[in-house]
A protein has these predicted regions:
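Non-heme di-metal
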Residues: 1-210
């Protein structure tokens, strides 16, 4: 994971101390386009497993799909501010074509490893967003100049129910909060993966996903 992180930094020209608007925009688009893949792949596999074994899934599918959908919304919101170039779109397609089958087979043979990998991925995303917000708040940085007074997109205001005068920094704070929640994918790797999901057990008094 350490090697992947620094390779990703190199590809996206990421300067931790004073990143440029362009490098961060590219980084967020690529990061969020990939982050929505694992949850959907895992949910898809578990959907077929439930059909094949004629058994309930006990809430895993709905939880993983919600995570994937949330990551997709992060991407759509980021695209309201940053525009994806032809190179970026080509890179996303190429990586997705490799990543999707690789994660699918990983989930077949060792699902706990995939959940652990996603946990590390989300932890890395948290570090990225914390650093971006810190740079926006620091006068004299490139991101402060570009984004300090940028308003939040209408889509973000509606999705996170932000006030009408919310800023782009507020939006990034909401995305970071989501990533902080997603990093608990770590804990999924410690659970028995084909028994009652812990969330469903806690919600046994109300209707819950099956």
């Amino acid at each position: 994971m350490y090697g992947l992180y620094h390779t990703f930094n190199f590809i996206t020209s990421y300067d931790h101390k004073d990143p440029s608007e362009k490098s961060i925009a590219w980084r967020l688009i690529v990061l969020e386009s990939l982050a929505g893949v694992p949850g959907f792949v895992a949910a898809g596999y578990r959907h077929f497993h439930s059909l094949r074994t004629l058994q309930r899934d006990h809430g895993w599918i709905a939880t993983l799909l919600e995570e994937a959908e949330n990551e997709r919304m992060h991407l759509i919101v980021c695209l309201e501010v940053a525009k994806a170039s032809t190179l970026t779109r080509s890179m996303v397609i190429a990586v997705q074509m490799v990543m999707t089958p690789a994660l699918f087979f990983l989930y077949i043979f060792h699902p706990k490893s995939m959940h652990r990998f996603v946990g590390y991925l989300e932890e890395t995303a948290c570090y990225t967003y914390v650093n971006v917000i810190r740079n926006i708040e620091t006068p004299g940085t490139k991101l402060h100049t570009a984004w300090a007074h940028l308003p939040a997109p209408a889509l973000a205001i509606g999705y996170w129910r932000l006030p009408a005068d919310a800023s782009w920094k507020d939006t990034l704070g909401c995305i970071m909060a989501d990533e902080t929640h997603h990093r608990y994918s770590y804990s999924y790797s410690s659970l028995k993966l084909f028994v009652n999901f812990v969330f469903v057990s806690a919600m046994s008094t109300i209707r819950s996903p099956i």
